[in-house]
Amino acid sequence: PDDNSKADMSYSGYLLYKGMNRDLLNQGNNPKSKYRAGMLFRLADFYLLYAEALNHVNPGDARIIQYVDSVRYRAGIPLLKDIKPGIIGNRELQEKAIRHERRIELFAEGQRYFDVRRWMCAEEEGYKQGGPVHGMDMNATDLEGFMKRTAFETRIFEKRMYLYPIPLAEIQKSKKLVQNPGW
């Protein structure tokens, strides 16, 4: 309670349980560290990426819904083919469902940043990338103040951020290489 260092704290007031080593939860303040391998690639990510690619090439391909439903089945939630049969074969509706599935399934895994840029929709409602990031008021002295929704960070998004800058050393190596717009 008297520690004002703010070391090892959440800036937003929210703590993430996903991916946590559950063996450490009940070991008090000083749990013994246990190795837990980090995920580099997840099968669900590949299934959803493949469904997205199939949808762009051939929206009528039955594997699109099968791959999305494989992810949903593993999570124990209703299958798209059962709850939204009307989207099957419709490119736009399937794309919307795949994007939604990626947002939920891959939450806090660092994929959203790249998805939104790949889809080039960072300025659209529901996908916006710039602006304030909200959380709890971590400077509050009481519970009521803590529960107040507070902006703790402001992020910037510019159109040029859809593409990365090409390193100057690479541009200098090639006479035909041109810097990406805005950089």
PLM regions: where:
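Acidic/polar-rich alpha-helix caps and helix-coil junctions
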Residues: 1-183
